[in-house]
């Protein structure tokens, strides 16, 4: 868990040493999708989206691949999953799946090498602000955990058999820092709110669908894209 999806994307790039390269991201997304690569001295190669799904257009991704392309940030737009399977047919590099707007989408977070989620105030499961990184890569996970808290690896159990001063059980004041890290963990208050919001996910989604239906009814005289 991290303090935002933005921090999550940044940490993934730093943990994997992705820098000084080209990173593909879509034209339609929140600005941080394009900004995070710049923080890592990368070029944001912004490619077109499919006019119906509003997700990455695989053909335009293919046209924009370069020898120096080291990552693709594939955004699941408004609950619609990005075409990662299609992109995998011609690209075998790192794909970060941006699940900020797909907390309730079946299969979300399972296609990319790593997924980043958002619990910011306007998302499906808000906790004020916050985010999460998910991956099946154990090596990457082991790097990310201490990176969220200044590279400190000894804070997870502060009460030890030897407190380091008296030789007796007690609170340990020493820190072990094995790597460069950042202060971007999720605080307990955010986590507690998230756990409660999970219980309300169905209700929140039902309300969002009600709002969507109302918009569609009121704007029915305008040109519509096919419903998802």
Question: What is each model feature region?
Answer:
Residues 38, 47, 75-78, 102-104, ...:
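Structured catalytic cores of enzymes that bind and process phosphorylated ligands/cofactors
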Residues 59, 71-75, 80, 84, ...:
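PLP-dependent aminotransferase class I/II
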Residues 14-99, 103:
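PLP-dependent aminotransferase-like
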Residues 65, 88-94, 127, 132-153:
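Basic phosphate/pyrophosphate-binding loop/patch that engages nucleotide-derived ligands
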Residues 8-16, 131, 194:
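Buried hydrophobic packing segments
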Residues 1-7, 11, 164-166:
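Conserved N-terminal alpha-helix of the aminotransferase class I/II PLP-enzyme fold
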Residues 94-127, 132, 142, 172-177:
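Conserved active-site segment immediately N-terminal to the catalytic lysine
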